């Protein structure tokens, strides 16, 4: 069984912030992922914050996690440049992002 981190950005909308983590958990269960951590932070136009990237890399080193499950690339960054930059930094540590 592969081990994964769930990552999502909180929108401030109660229904959405409740529904998204449940959807991501179900996706992990249906696809054979063991959830090691569920991480979230307020939505930002920059995407994943530097402290969150640091936390994900730390979990990768301590928990042997190499997959991040998220709802869409928009949760990684608001622009293609932000997304590519984040994916590049994470891939240096053999961490890959899978969106549903």
What are these regions (language model features)?
Residues 1-100:
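Short, structured surface patches at the beginning of a domain
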